[in-house]
Each structure stands twice: as C-alpha cells, then as structure tokens.
C-alpha cells in the first residue's frame, strides 16, 4: 500500500531534482524556467498528498490557484525570453548584464 510517506519522498525528490537544475545550470534561461516549474509541481504534489491524507479539499483547491499563477509565470517568462533572444541572439544569463534606460 502506498502511504503518505511515499508521496512525500517523491515530492522531495522532484523538488531536489529541480533545485539541482537551478544550481547546476545557471546559464540557460529556459532550463531555469523549467526547473522552477518542476519545483512548483513538486510543491503541488505535496499539497495534494496532504489534502488526500487529511480528507480536506482545501489543498486541492489551492493547487488550482498555484497552477494558474505558474501558467501565467511561464507565459510571461517565455515571452520575455523570446524578446531577449530577438534582441541579443542569446538566452545565456551571463550575457544579460547590461541595462539600457
């Protein structure tokens, strides 16, 4: 039988993988965005696991709000990334150190 501990371990593994993705690859904006999204999904997975374990639907409802914000974040982040790529021909974070007013 799968218990709450199994779900929490899986959520922690997903969170750890996404944290490794952020810390090991700080150069590519696309990989950073994907790692942040994976981190949010790991947190949502834990919300759903606790919600199911406690028999309360509040955690599941909260997940819908988090997914909505994550979708908006992804859309805005990808739009900014496309604009930066059109102007600079790169999505390398190290090359994005100049601000123009």
From Swiss-Prot:
Its EC number is 7.1.1.-. It is a multi-pass membrane protein. GO terms for cellular component: NADH dehydrogenase complex; plasma membrane. This is NADH-quinone oxidoreductase subunit K. Its main location: membrane. NDH-1 shuttles electrons from NADH, via FMN and iron-sulfur (Fe-S) centers, to quinones in the respiratory chain. The immediate electron acceptor for the enzyme in this species is believed to be ubiquinone. Couples the redox reaction to proton translocation (for every two electrons transferred, four hydrogen ions are translocated across the cytoplasmic membrane), and thus conserves the redox energy in a proton gradient. It is found in: Cell inner membrane.
């Amino acid at each position: 039988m799968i218990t709450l501990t199994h779900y929490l371990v899986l959520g922690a593994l997903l969170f750890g993988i996404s944290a490794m993705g952020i810390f090991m690859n700080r150069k590519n904006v696309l990989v950073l965005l994907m790692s942040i999204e994976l981190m949010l999904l790991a947190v949502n997975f834990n919300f759903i696991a606790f919600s199911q374990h406690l028999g309360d639907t509040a955690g599941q409802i909260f997940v819908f709000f988090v997914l909505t914000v994550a979708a908006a974040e992804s859309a805005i982040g990808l739009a900014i990334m496309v604009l930066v790529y059109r102007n600079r021909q790169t999505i390398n974070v190290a090359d994005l150190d100049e601000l123009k007013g």
